[in-house]
A protein has these predicted regions:
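N-terminal Rossmann NAD(P)H-binding glycine-rich loop of SDR-like oxidoreductase domains
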Residues: 1-20
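SDR active-site strand-loop-helix element
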Residues: 3, 27, 68, 105-111, ...
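Conserved glycine-rich Rossmann-like NAD(P)H-binding loop of the short-chain dehydrogenase/reductase
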Residues: 22-32
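NAD(P)H-binding glycine-rich loop region in Rossmannoid oxidoreductase-like domains
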Residues: 48-85
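Conserved Rossmann-fold NAD(P)-dependent oxidoreductase catalytic core, especially the SDR/UDP-sugar
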Residues: 90-132
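Active-site helix of classical SDR
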Residues: 132, 136-139
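NAD(P)-dependent short-chain dehydrogenase/reductase
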Residues: 142-197, 202-206, 236-238
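C-terminal substrate-binding subdomain of Rossmann-fold SDR/epimerase-dehydratase oxidoreductases
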Residues: 183-272
Length: 272
């Protein structure tokens, strides 16, 4: 069972599992939107208002819940992460595990939980969140660990690094670059592009969830382990498109809440 199936990551997680022959139920709030998403076509799509306080959804016996849903992901500084997303997501997951029908719960976390770390980080590295989004994720993780002592369920926490690909928000930097190239623009405004970050195609990140349901529960980084500068990634995208555009470096300042260099030190393919 996958929540957030119409989202950027969720749709690719659903497709990864259906391609491997799993029976997948995609819990969505917008059936019409879900029916238009190619990656969901082999899944069973069910309407579910997961944040409804009166939700009475019955989970199938021995099912696996992969929770990708989260609101306001475009704005990491929104107070809604702590005021709405944290309690709403905890209530939904608590309700799910207390039915005692789930064999495992996999939750999508974020590398932003580490805060302004510089360099490689392990899944065991300390967290120091510095945005409402990251703080809410860390608190949810801690609350679920406490809940385990009462409800005894298998919990896997997956900290995602930087992803790109089909379904990404059109206002993210890579879709904006592609749009500028398609529109024949001469320049593309960006920062200096010196950020050294752990980027991976969303399809590869989604496939790693297949491993997460088979290995021991715990906390893992969903990462490539190979950092690349943002400027180099932009050049790589242009090369793949066989197009060129002048990168107007330094037009934007670096965001104070974002790490200038962070990558996962323990990708799953090196652990197992």
């Amino acid at each position: 069972m996958v929540t957030g199936g119409t989202g950027f990551l969720g749709r690719h997680v659903v497709e990864s599992f259906t391609k491997k022959g799993y029976q997948v139920i995609a819990l969505v709030r917008d059936i019409q939107k879900a029916n238009k998403i190619q990656q969901l076509q082999k899944a069973k799509i069910e309407h579910c208002e997961i944040y409804n306080k009166n939700l009475s959804y019955a989970f199938p016996v021995n099912s696996i819940l992969i929770h990708c849903a989260w609101g306001d992901v475009k704005d990491s500084m929104s107070p809604n992460h702590l005021e709405l997303n944290l309690p709403d997501n905890y209530r939904f997951i608590k309700n799910a595990v207390e039915q005692k029908k789930l064999s495992r719960v996999v939750i999508s976390g974020s590398c932003y939980e580490y805060g302004l770390k510089y360099g490689p980080v392990f899944a065991s590295s300390s967290t120091k969140p510095n945005t409402p989004y990251a703080i809410a994720k860390v608190k949810l993780h801690k609350n679920l660990v406490k809940l385990q002592s009462k409800s005894n369920f298998k919990l896997t926490w997956a900290r995602l690094f930087y992803m790109y690909g089909e379904g990404q928000d059109e206002n993210s930097i890579i879709p904006l670059l592609k749009k500028a190239i398609r529109n024949g623009e001469k320049k593309f405004n960006m920062s200096y592009g010196e950020q050294l970050l752990d980027y991976m195609p969303v399809e590869i990140a989604a496939k790693q969830f297949l491993s997460l349901i088979e290995i021991d529960p715990g906390t893992y980084n969903i990462c490539s382990g190979s950092p690349i500068s943002l400027r180099r990634l932009m050049e790589q995208i242009m090369s793949e498109m066989n197009k060129n555009i002048e990168l107007n470096l330094g037009y934007y300042k670096y965001r104070k809440q974002d790490s200038i260099a962070i990558w996962g030190a323990d990708p799953l393919n090196q652990i197992f």
